[in-house]
Amino acid sequence: MPVLEHRHDIRDDVVALTFDDGPSPWTEPMLDLLAAHEGHATFFALGCVADADGADETLRLILESGSEIGNHTFSHPSLPKLDDDSIRDELERAGSVIEEASGTTLRYWRPPFFHVDKRVRKVVSPLGLQEVGCSMMPWDWEWDAARSAAFVIERLQRGSIVCMHDGRPPNEPADLSAPTREASVAAVGMILDAMSRRGLRPVTISELLLAR
């Protein structure tokens, strides 16, 4: 299956919002913002986080809101650095944990750091998951809310896939000076307001694929 990064062939005024590295305490505020704008998103969850106490409740909230969940591997490694068995284990282990916790079947995956090559794709292909890239990704793990929002708003167009973050991966360096995901939440609020003014509707990857 080809990598999905943008849909250029549609007339519907939709944009797919995606969030990586959750679930986390910042996931529910993201869902509240989406609900206020009658929108949905796709949350690419980490298996190691989804396995934590209370994560199943957050995952179910995602689904109950009309949003959906994707596979972001178990431990957020750079997949090309792993052997074939380890790559497969990262996706299968995450899928098992997330599906058991959420009660849904996963259809999409996203490689950590967007690090992927032909070998990785060949290993993952039998799992039947659609790889999802993105049209744009602000450095919301480092930037303040205004900068992240401006980066996205300037580039938004029909069919875009926006990648942001509702959690922190286990291998992210601790930087006490960097914005927390609260900055990401604030940026999403600004982005959704701008989308509303421009008549753009936030949707899941599945909804983007169904757009005309």
Segments (PLM) and residue ranges:
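A cross-domain feature marking catalytic cores of carbohydrate-active enzymes
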Residues: F19-D21, A45-G47, N71-T73, R110-F113, ...
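Conserved, mostly hydrophobic/aromatic
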Residues: D20, L34, I69-H72, A94, ...
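Glycine-enriched alpha-helix->loop->beta-strand junction motifs that scaffold or abut catalytic
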Residues: H37-H40, S65-I69, V123-V132, R158
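His/Asp/Glu-enriched short active-site or ligand-binding loop at hydrolase and phosphoryl-transfer sites
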Residues: H115, R119-L156, L200-A211
